[in-house]
Swiss-Prot record:
Pfam families: DAGK_acc (PF00609), DAGK_cat (PF00781). Belongs to the eukaryotic diacylglycerol kinase family. Residues 43-194 form the DAGKc domain. It catalyses: a 1,2-diacyl-sn-glycerol + ATP = a 1,2-diacyl-sn-glycero-3-phosphate + ADP + H(+). This is Diacylglycerol kinase 6. InterPro entries: ATP-NAD_kinase_N, DGK, Diacylglycerol_kin_accessory, Diacylglycerol_kinase_cat_dom, NAD/diacylglycerol_kinase_sf. Monomer. Disulfide bonds: none annotated. GO terms for molecular function: ATP binding; ATP-dependent diacylglycerol kinase activity. It comes from Arabidopsis thaliana (Mouse-ear cress). Its EC number is 2.7.1.107.
Amino acid sequence: MVQSETSMEKYKNLSDFLKKFFIPSYVLSPEDEPEAQISCTTAPENPILVFINSKSGGQLGAELILTYRTLLNDKQVFDLEVETPDKVLQRIYLNLERLKDDSLASKIRDKLKIIVAGGDGTAGWLLGVVSDLNLSNPPPIATVPLGTGNNLPFAFGWGKKNPGTDRSSVESFLGKVINAKEMKIDNWKILMRMKHPKEGSCDITLKLPHSLPRIFPSDQENMEGYHTYRGGFWNYFSLGMDAQVSYAFHSQRKLHPERFKNQLVNQSTYLKLSCTQGWFFASLFHPSSQNIAKLAKIQICDRNGQWNDLHIPQSIRSIVCLNLPSFSGGLNPWGTPNPKKQRDRSLTAPFVDDGLIEIVGFRNAWHGLILLSPNGHGTRLAQANRVRLEFKKGAAKHAYMRIDGEPWKQPLPSNDETVMVEISHHGQVNMLATQNCRSKSMYESSSIIRFSNDEDDSSVVENEEF
C-alpha cells in the first residue's frame, strides 16, 4: 500500500495540467487496490503510457525516463531495456478487462494514448506490438525523436532533433500530445524464407533485427525445408548501398558506443561511412558494387491482384520500398508526380493509408542529394500493394537490407538454396500527428497536394553512369 499512497500523494500535488495525463496505479497493476486511489475520481483527459529506450540518444533516454517519472506516476513510464512493450501492454489490458465495470478504468481505456521515445526501430517495435494485440480501440501513438534519422517522428510533425529532457521540454511535448490529431498509417508485413542452409553455405549465424523474428514450426506460414522469418515495418524496407552504409554505422556503434552519444557526431560519422563504403564513388573504390538488377528478380502486385515483373535500370544500386514521406532524416524520395505523370504511369501522391507502397531507386549518394533540391526525387519505379524479391544464385555472397533503420547482412544463395522476401499490406494503426505533419491521408479533405513541375522521372538513366 505504500506505493499506492505515495503515487496518490504525488497526484494531489500535481498541477492541473499534469493531472490530465496521470493514471492511478490500480489501473496499471492488479496488485494495487482502487480504494487506495479514492481521491482520484476524475478521469484524466489524456491518459498516457510512456515507453522509452534508455539507450537511445546517448544519455538522453535515461534522463528522459527520470523526468517523466518525476512528473507522472512512475508506474506509467517504462524503460524498454528493462521490460518489453508486449508484456507491459498485455498486462495492462488484461487488468483493464478485469476492471471493465470500473467507470474510471473504462474511461482511461477509451482515452488511452502512448508515447514512445527512441529511434525509428524502437517506434516501429511499439507500433508492431499494438498492431499484434488486435485491440477493438487501439491507442494512438506519439513518437519522440531520440534516434539518428528520426524519420517516423518527422513524418508526423514531432521533429527530428533530439529533445530536451528537462521538465519544461517534457511539458511542452505533452501539450502537443493534447492537441495532436489521429491519423491512420499502413502496416507492411515482411516475410523472408531461406531454404535450409547446407554446412558451410548460407550463413547459419544470421543476425536479424528483433522486428523480424523466426516463426514457430507450428505457424501456418512455416514451410518444411525452409527457415521463415516474419515481421513488419511502417516506414521503409531498403536493399543495397544505403543499407550497407547503415550496417557499417550500426556495427561501429556496437563496437564503440562511447563515440556515438551526440546526434551531430552520429550524422557526421554516417556521412564519412557513405564515402568509405563507396556510396559516393563506386567506380573508384567499389567497382564490383552490385546493382539491384543483378541481385534479385523483383515482382509487384497491384490492388487487383495482378503480378508483374518490375524493370530495374542497370545503374540502380539501392531501392527503397517507402510508406512515409520521410527517409534518411526527413527527405522525400517519391515527391509528388505531376498530373501528366500520374495519368501516363498511373502514379499517385504518396498517401500513408492507401494500401500502396512507393518503390524508389537510387544510383548513388549524388543521386540521393537531388532530394535536397526543390521538386527533387529518386527514380520512381512503381507503386504496389505487394512486392516479391527472389535472390539469384551466385549473384553475390550477401546483400545488405534494412527495415525502419535496422540493418542486417543477408547471405544469398550459392548453390540450390533460395532466399525470398515478400512485402504485403497488413492492416493499420493510429498515429498522433501535430499541425506540422508531413504525411497525407487519402481521406482528408485538407490533403491538398502541390504538384511538382518535373517532366523527367529520373527513370531514364539506364545508360547513365557516374
